[in-house]
Amino acid sequence: MNPIGDIDLKDCPNLTLLDVAYTGISELDLTNCTQLDTLLCYGNNLSKLDLSKLIGLRKLDAKKNQLTSIDLSSCVNLGYLDLQGNQLSEIDLSMLTGLHTLALGANKLSKIDLADLPEIETLLVNDNQLKVLELSKLIQLATLYCNGNQLTKLDLSNQPLLQMLQAYGNQLTACDVNDLYASLCSYPKGVTLQMPYSLYITNDKSNPDNDAQHADPTIATIKGWRVNTEGDASGCDQVYVEVAPTTHGKIQLADKQGNVIKPVWSTLPTHLGYHKVNKDQEISLIIKPEEGYTIDRLTANGEQISGTSLTPQRYTRINALFKLDNAVIAPAQSHCIAISSEGITTLADLAMLTIFTIDGQTYYHQPIGRGELVTLPQGSYLVTAQAVAAGETEVIQVLIP
């Protein structure tokens, strides 16, 4: 610390950067500093801070002071805000729509509204009194510290860029931890970790802490996350069954009565495969190949399934591979498809033509008119054609010599 006593800034109207960190000040008059861009006043004894004239302020670091409240309504250009280690019990952030870094750890916050902060990339709200943390609008979030609160739920399904999470020291049950793991998006590619783990869910010094020892970390690790706590998956009477994305068909889960089990997240493309079922509950797999395809291989956690039912004990990932159905036969008289040694055309005025290679890859998918020729190299293909006017669809297997 470098004590300097009082600071007189009355004659500094053009000041853009002010660093008074660890100077021992208890008051700071910024009335005339209307051009200030960066303010570093951390590690002092400030109990109040008037920022009403600092419209252009972009960075504020006022951590480790004695602030019990702060008015940020004039600081509409703030991008970086650090108020850690104060005594704030509430804060209004609604005007700070450009914030990318927000650090509010070690305060007395019992709630926080982040709905107007879509640009946040780094969020530190650790060691507060939060029972709920709503993050659905923070789609740019990459780093989250929410450890040391009273959270019982944490949904991160809208955070595809998240790469560091510290959530230990909360009150999540084993089921809640599983829900958190399931909500995580796949770990971003190309990220180099600076720490041993990307997800800290427990801590030896935290009491109480999350029951991660009885949760199932596979739900997270299979997506590339490195979790600091092993779990035995024994603490929850429900398990997650994930149906991996498929091509040329789909898999649905159903209970014994044939009722389709709906995904937990029905509107998120990244999470459509997640289903929650009771442990030891027998479930059926409803297999629906696309027209012209059949199921080739069905696995659960890499092991081939011989039937169409299973009884999961912990997280289970279902993979299905569909192949061309060799039993598909061309119609006796085609009204839509014409074949020559050079390729395929349509007999309809307009048809949507889709051509698949023998390994199931889409080779061509375009509307064509009568007489237009789609040339094909030598090989075997599956062709579907839908006549736009008649609404008829034909499927035919084609061999180009």
Task: Annotate the PLM regions.
Residues 361-390:
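Short, surface-exposed loop/turn motifs with a glycine/proline- and acidic-biased composition
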Residues 326-332, 380-401:
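C-terminal tail/sorting-segment detector
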Residues 2, 23, 44, 65, ...:
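Consensus "Asn ladder" position of solenoid repeat domains
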Residues 16-20, 37-41, 58-62, 79-83, ...:
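Conserved hydrophobic beta-strand positions in leucine-rich repeat
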Residues 280-307:
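Surface-exposed interfaces of beta-sheet-rich extracellular modules
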Residues 6-7, 28-30, 49-51, 70, ...:
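Canonical leucine-rich repeat
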Residues 239-245, 308-327:
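Conserved "repeat-terminator" motif of extracellular CCP/Sushi domains
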Residues 4, 15, 25, 36-37, ...:
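Conserved hydrophobic position(s) of the canonical leucine-rich repeat
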